[in-house]
């Protein structure tokens, strides 16, 4: 019988073993995935393990599409594993895997990564994420999570204390390093959600473009003092100016006019309670208050 002694032997070692011409010892060639751009879009592309199976990202999502089928050579050997001469061998030809073309744009991805790296350094942040999408068709042109990792060395941690870690600690750090924060983590939308509030209120007719509001820099809602980002307030302004100023009191006022029921209806109609079904593993779901739990303060914030 045949026994595999060691997988993933480097080429130099394999060539030396061949030179010894040892009876019954055979070096089989294998293939390893190589990533020419090292860190580019590392968490999106993903990487393969020692058995060439996808581990994260597109590599694992499209494993069955990319992997193909191995070929085989069936021979007859003696008890020592040496092939018998004059005996016909059967060959099963390999079937190549398919090619996957992504919507990522190399230039846009590279530029976004450079910009994110600059912010990471300037702000001394733990991480910076950028997602650039074509809103007309949903194509992703760039998905950045810096610091990225080297796809050709995916098990190498950029941590000086790596040698002091337990196996469990090291695996946890690797899992965090491989995590695609753009889709695996949830985060508060902040003022970007004012777009949803504006659309819902305009559609329902609870506000018009020339409605006027007064912003003293805060609103008292029940027992909460909710501030605007401009401490002294924006004063008197129209709804359009309120949008331009991203004025919190304006949106608190129109949100209360809309009410929680209609607000939740539009939340669902915009698809915010559903997954996007992006073809990457581990998309996080929306975290939202239950309808019955949305009171004046929740609606205002």
Give the role of each language-model region.
Residues 1-6, 129-130, 251-257:
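Conserved short loop/turn motifs at secondary-structure junctions
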Residues 2-5, 85-128:
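Conserved, well-ordered alpha-helix/loop/beta-strand core segments that scaffold catalytic motifs
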Residues 14, 18, 41-45, 59-63, ...:
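Extracytoplasmic/secreted envelope proteins and their assembly/folding machinery
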Residues 34-38, 93-94, 123-124, 134-135, ...:
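Extracellular/periplasmic catalytic domains that process cell-envelope and extracellular macromolecules
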Residues 1-97:
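Small/polar-residue-rich segments within soluble enzyme cores
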Residues 112, 130-141:
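Short, glycine-anchored, charge-dense loop/turn motifs used at functional sites
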Residues 23-27, 121-135:
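Short N-terminal helix-loop-first-beta-strand/juxtamembrane motif that initiates sensory/input modules
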Residues 78-88, 136-191, 196-301:
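Beta-lactam-recognizing serine transpeptidase/beta-lactamase-like catalytic domain environment
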């Amino acid at each position: 019988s045949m026994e595999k002694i060691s997988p993933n032997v480097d080429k130099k070692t394999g060539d030396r073993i061949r030179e010894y011409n040892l009876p019954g010892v055979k070096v089989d060639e294998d293939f390893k995935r190589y990533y020419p751009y090292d860190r580019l879009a590392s968490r999106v592309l993903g990487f393969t393990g020692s058995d060439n199976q996808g581990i994260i990202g597109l590599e694992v999502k499209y494993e069955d599409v990319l992997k193909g089928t191995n070929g085989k050579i069936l021979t007859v050997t003696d008890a020592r594993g040496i092939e018998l001469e004059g005996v016909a061998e059967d060959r099963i030809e390999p079937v190549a895997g398919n090619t996957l073309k992504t919507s990522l744009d190399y230039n846009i991805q590279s530029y976004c990564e450079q910009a994110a790296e600059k912010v990471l350094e300037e702000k001394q942040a733990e991480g910076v994420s950028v997602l650039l999408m074509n809103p007309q068709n949903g194509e992703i042109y760039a998905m950045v999570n810096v610091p990225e990792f080297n796809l050709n060395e995916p098990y190498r941690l950029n941590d000086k204390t790596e040698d002091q870690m337990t196996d469990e600690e090291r695996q946890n750090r690797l899992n965090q390093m491989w995590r695609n924060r753009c889709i695996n983590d949830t985060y508060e939308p902040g003022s970007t959600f004012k777009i949803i509030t504006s659309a819902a209120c305009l559609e329902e007719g609870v506000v018009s473009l020339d409605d006027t509001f007064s912003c003293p820099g805060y609103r008292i809602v029940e027992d909460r003092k909710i501030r605007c980002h401009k401490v002294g307030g924006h004063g008197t302004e129209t709804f359009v100016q309120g949008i331009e100023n991203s004025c919190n009191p304006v949106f608190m006022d129109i949100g209360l006019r809309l009410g929680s029921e209609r607000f939740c209806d539009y939340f669902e109609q915009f698809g915010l309670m559903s997954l996007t079904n992006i073809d990457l593993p581990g998309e996080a779901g929306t975290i939202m208050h239950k309808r019955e739990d949305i009171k004046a303060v929740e609606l205002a914030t």
